[in-house]
Amino acid sequence: MTAGSAIPSFRRGVKFRFDTTRDCWIILAPEKLFMPDEIAVEILQLVDGVREIDTIVDSLAARFDAPRDEIATDVIAALEDLSERGVIQLTDAE
């Protein structure tokens, strides 16, 4: 499982943006297009290559007034999935 101190960032060539034509958020990767769900969008909006996973979890738990453990499970699962798809890279914090 991914450690909470890992820092997620978008891989080179990956763009996360709002597509006005489709009226939704999209992830553009080399030769790939992903349409993340609402939960993934909330997570990805906090991915900046600086924040640790724990910080992202804390922000979302406070924003949605939800149990931190549940948020952590969702965030880690989403980031691990996106990492396997080549969208996100997870770097150990130093």
Model-derived regions, located:
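Acidic, low-complexity/disordered tracts enriched in E/D and polar residues
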Residues: 1-41, 45, 91-93
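Long, charge-rich, low-complexity alpha-helical segments
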Residues: 32-94
